[in-house]
């Protein structure tokens, strides 16, 4: 085992291709241990603080179960039940919380919040989701693709839907891991250039036609049309995105062995047809489970280094 200095995971670009190669293989090993009921407690007596400003099912469950399976335990905090919701400065909260725990996961709104927190933390901080990025989910998605089809390098991932935190994280992943990213969204919901790194220009292709975006894709993926915090726009978004539902016709334009993914929760009949998400090309349940395994690998790496 090798040690590593304090490292945060705030966006996908925070790690190198070499680190991702290690993490993805480590997730495979930890998943095998989980399936074989092997005890592995490298984080014995370590504490994870989970801070939630946004509600969650999969994020809380996967992190809480994951730290337990690694021998540690979790403490849940939300803004309703802590001083974070009563105006305590983020910098002060980071100083205090990071003196009492070993690692911190935050699910919040603006990326600036988690960046400020990490800047004053004495322990690793993990992005459990922000408005801008969702790195743990895309890490799970990449792992799922590799598990099902092998290397993602040189492949094409098609994103059909909103320019949200998942889309921006996929762009970073394409740059880091060497695949092409097709993006298609209706007018008015295009990518923010400020969140698209110049280094990813060679991997990104933008399409007006979602069918065209799916052509040649090895993976087609999407997300809800209305993310948390944008509920007031829901009806307008439904009208704008009605031609951006992932359909069997879109999957037929992709590669014959293409997969479908969705980070969940899904709305059948909106961003995806039931026939697609419940069909043979969908791997959404493996994708959801794999949050557990990649996050275990991530926490182990941030606290213990490489094994």
From Swiss-Prot:
Keyword Metal-binding: no
Catalytic activity: carbamoyl phosphate + L-ornithine = L-citrulline + phosphate + H(+)
Major localisation: cytoplasm
Location(s), subcellular: Cytoplasm
Keyword Membrane carried by entry: no
Family annotation (PROSITE patterns): CARBAMOYLTRANSFERASE
Binding positions (L-ornithine): 165, 223, 227-228
A molecular function (GO) term: amino acid binding
GO annotations of cellular component type: cytoplasm
One of the GO biological process terms: L-arginine biosynthetic process
Origin: domain of life: Bacteria
Entry's EC annotation: 2.1.3.3
Enzyme class (EC, first level): transferase
Assigned keywords, A-Z: Amino-acid biosynthesis, Arginine biosynthesis, Cytoplasm, Transferase
Annotated carbamoyl phosphate binding sites: 56-59, 83, 107, 134-137, 263-264, 291
Pfam families: OTCace, OTCace_N
The family this protein is said to belong to: Belongs to the aspartate/ornithine carbamoyltransferase superfamily. OTCase family.
Name of protein: Ornithine carbamoyltransferase
Organism: Cupriavidus pinatubonensis (strain JMP 134 / LMG 1197)
Gene responsible for this protein: argF
């Amino acid at each position: 085992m090798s040690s590593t200095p304090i490292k945060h995971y705030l966006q996908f670009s925070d790690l190198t291709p070499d680190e991702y190669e290690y993490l993805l293989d480590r997730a495979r090993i930890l998943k095998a241990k989980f399936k074989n009921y092997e005890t592995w407690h490298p984080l014995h007596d370590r504490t994870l603080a989970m801070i939630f400003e946004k509600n969650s099912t999969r994020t809380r469950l996967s992190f809480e179960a994951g730290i337990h399976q690694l021998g540690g335990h979790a403490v849940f905090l939300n803004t309703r039940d802590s001083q974070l919701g009563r105006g305590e400065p983020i910098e002060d909260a980071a100083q205090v919380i990071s003196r009492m725990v070993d690692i911190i996961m935050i699910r919040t709104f603006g990326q600036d919040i988690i960046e400020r927190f990490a800047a004053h933390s004495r322990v690793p901080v993990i992005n459990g989701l922000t408005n801008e990025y969702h790195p743990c989910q895309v890490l799970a998605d990449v792992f799922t693709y590799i598990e099902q089809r092998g290397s993602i390098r040189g492949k094409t991932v098609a994103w059909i839907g909103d320019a949200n935190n998942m889309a921006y994280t996929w762009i970073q992943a394409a740059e880091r891991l060497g695949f092409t990213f097709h993006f298609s969204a209706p007018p008015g919901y295009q990518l923010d250039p400020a969140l698209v790194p110049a280094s990813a220009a060679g991997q990104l292709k933008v399409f007006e036609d979602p069918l065209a975006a799916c052509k040649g894709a090895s993976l087609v993926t999407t997300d809800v049309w209305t993310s948390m915090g944008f509920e007031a726009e829901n009806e307008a978004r439904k009208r704008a995105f009605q031609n951006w539902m992932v359909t069997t016709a879109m999957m037929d334009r992709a590669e014959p062995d293409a997969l479908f993914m969705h980070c969940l929760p899904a709305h059948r009949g909106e961003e995806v047809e039931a026939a697609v998400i419940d069909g043979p090309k969908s791997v959404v349940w493996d994708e959801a489970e794999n949050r557990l395994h990649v996050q275990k690998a991530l926490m182990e790496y941030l606290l213990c280094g490489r094994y």
